[in-house]
Every structure is written in structure tokens, then in C-alpha cells.
């Protein structure tokens, strides 16, 4: 019993220490207001961005949700912050939450865009498309199938022996590859131009094509690259999603997400084939030829 208490104490202590690694700002007085489809959270320094962002969010809501034929079950939280010298956006699709850093980002590899319109549409497209692709809803982000085998125990006072085999197989609740997640979020919806294909993006893709260095279909499925590699996952994903929309209709992006929501579907190659009639690898080859 003492041993169990000790282990529990270590667990609680570890959780407490982990919490100390993060930081907050207790001096900030957060405020919230509601729109038809969003809860907007801000403080004095971000109120202007929050009110403009709320307008943008409501303007793009019908377009993004119509593309995927899906609306979040509850109002999506959008948090506007500007604590640090930092620009970004993040979508937590299992929490139905978006964080927006209010400072505009002018990224050399993507040209100039209107920041709030771009980042809010991008992150909300993540929320909608990835929730559409979930296999078991928002309450079950994943599971493990596990099997344990124990040694035979000879002593009658011991219930079972020491574990000698462990099989653990993950069952993710969402299996959208990075190129599709980011590519569809940059595509946004038909007619959107907040994150358009500009000369900067074209330069990156053209350079890879001319040097026979296009990311393969497999390479597009992962991040963790060096140099411009991670940006090329975004860039190639945007180009491929645009190719899909142009050749099979924007609805094909939704159909791919629908196929990936099938609890037994874990192959992007097969999901694309179900949605478009051609396999993912064949579609990629056609995309490569078009470049």
C-alpha cells in the first residue's frame, strides 16, 4: 500500500512540475463576447483584432461549412492573444478551439496577405475539415489495442507471473496526412483569395520541379524535414489540393475527408480512390505531370 501511495505521489508531483513548465499571465483581464457561431476571447490589448476577427469569422463560416457539409456541434472558441513577439495561428480541433496571435505575419516564402482574414479562415478550415474526418467523434481521439502475456507462475500465493510479451497497436481517431490537412486549409474554399497561389509559392514548386526534387507522395505525408522541406509540405499540399479541386471539383476534398472518417479506412491512397475514382498514387503522378 505504501508503494502504491509512493507511485501515486510521484505521478501527482510529476504532473505538478510539468504544469510549472508552462506560463500564464494572471495580470490579464480576459473578456468574452458571442457571435452566432463563435465565442471570442480577448483582453484590452487585443480587442480591436478580436472584433475585426469576429466579423471575419462569421463572414467565412457559411463558405467553409458548406464545402464540407459540416458545422461544429458547439460554438468555436477563438482566443486572440499578443503576449509575445510572435505571429501564428493554431487549431485544436478536438477542443473546438482556435488561438490567434494578433501580430501580422508577412512570411517571405508566401508573399503578403491580409493577416486576420488569412489566419482565421485557415484555422477554421482546419477545425471543420478535421472534425469531418474524425472516426469516433470528438470524445474519442484515439485508442490502443493491447495484449499482454504473462509468465507461468508456480507459486500459489501469486496471482500471475511477470509480463513477458506486450503487443500495442494504436487506433487513431483521425488520420489526415499533413499535405491534405494543410493543403485544404490553404485552399480554404472555392473563390477564397486570402491565401492565394502567388509567385513566391510558384517559385518554390518550380525550383523543385526543375531540379527533379519534387516531394514524393510519401514524403508529402510527413513533416520533420530540414531547411525548406517543411514549407514544401505546405506548398506541395496546397498545389495538390488545388489540382484535386480543379480536376474533380472542390467537393472531392470533402469526400476524401468522409472516406477517412470510416473507422476501417487508414489509407489515404484508398480514400482518394473512393472519392475520385483514381488511386492516390495515380492522382499524384497526374499532378506531377501537370507541373
Regions found by a protein language model. Give the residues of each.
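Acidic/His/Gly-enriched intrinsically disordered linker/tail segments
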Residues: 25, 95, 115-119, 131-291
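Bacterial Sec-dependent N-terminal signal peptides
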Residues: 1-24
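Generic low-complexity, intrinsically disordered sequence content enriched
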Residues: 14-17, 113, 257
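Juxtacatalytic substrate-recognition/specificity segment
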Residues: 19-170
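Residue-level marker of positions within ordered structural domains that often coincide
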Residues: 13-16, 69, 190, 246
